[in-house]
From Swiss-Prot:
Role of this protein: Necessary for efficient RNA polymerase transcription elongation past template-encoded arresting sites. The arresting sites in DNA have the property of trapping a certain fraction of elongating RNA polymerases that pass through, resulting in locked ternary complexes. Cleavage of the nascent transcript by cleavage factors such as GreA or GreB allows the resumption of elongation from the new 3'terminus. GreB releases sequences of up to 9 nucleotides in length.
Lineage of origin: Bacteria, Pseudomonadati, Pseudomonadota, Gammaproteobacteria, Pasteurellales
Record Pfam families: GreA_GreB, GreA_GreB_N
Keywords attached to this entry: Coiled coil, DNA-binding, Transcription, Transcription regulation
UniProt GO molecular function: DNA binding; RNA polymerase binding
Coiled-coil residues: 53-75
SUPFAM superfamilies according to UniProt: FKBP-like, GreA transcript cleavage protein, N-terminal domain
Protein family per UniProt: Belongs to the GreA/GreB family. GreB subfamily.
Organism in which the protein naturally occurs: Haemophilus influenzae (strain ATCC 51907 / DSM 11121 / KW20 / Rd)
Domain of life: Bacteria
Protein name: Transcription elongation factor GreB
Keyword rRNA processing: no
Record keyword Zinc present: no
């Protein structure tokens, strides 16, 4: 399945900030370090030079990715019409059949962060939740079988 191109405004700004940091701050520092290491002479056994060149390639790869990705991403802002229903950017409190609750935020694949309970819009749980309302029951297929979740709360960061 292809990655969706949706992102929250905060997510887009974070990626843009990362791009600017890499291009304007990190890359010039690493370029200078590589230049200094190259001036020391033999480059074949110069660990600083070799590491610096590797780091420069990593930065350039990430800069290319971010530049291309930021061009195609679609920012999805909060809309008051979304209230009461689950859409992109929503925080949702779910309850499983055992009564355990957990809160998730539906975000773009570029913002996916399990530690923050941010799930990708492309995930099975998020896809099953889209359009649901308070007290709806949702069946989600997982690798271990189907699970049933109940929508307890829906809210948006405005």
């Amino acid at each position: 399945m292809a990655k969706s191109n949706y992102i929250t405004r905060q997510g887009w700004l974070a990626l843009d900030q990362e791009l600017k940091f890499l291009w304007k701050e990190e890359r010039p520092k690493v370029t200078q370090a590589v230049s200094d290491a190259a001036a020391l002479g033999d480059r074949s056994e110069n660990a600083e030079y070799i590491y610096g060149k590797r780091r420069l390639r990593e930065i350039d790869r990430r800069v290319r990715f971010l530049t291309k990705r930021l061009e195609v991403l679609q920012i999805v802002d909060y809309n008051p019409k979304q209230e009461g229903k689950v859409f992109f950017g929503a925080w949702v409190e779910l309850e499983n059949e055992e009564g355990e609750t957990k809160q998730y935020r539906i975000v773009g694949c570029d913002e996916f962060a399990p530690a923050k309970n941010w799930i990708s819009i492309d995930s099975p749980v998020a896809r099953a939740l889209i359009g649901k309302t308070l007290d709806d029951e949702v069946r989600v297929e997982t690798p271990s079988g189907f699970i049933t979740l109940y929508v307890n709360k829906i809210w948006y960061e405005k």
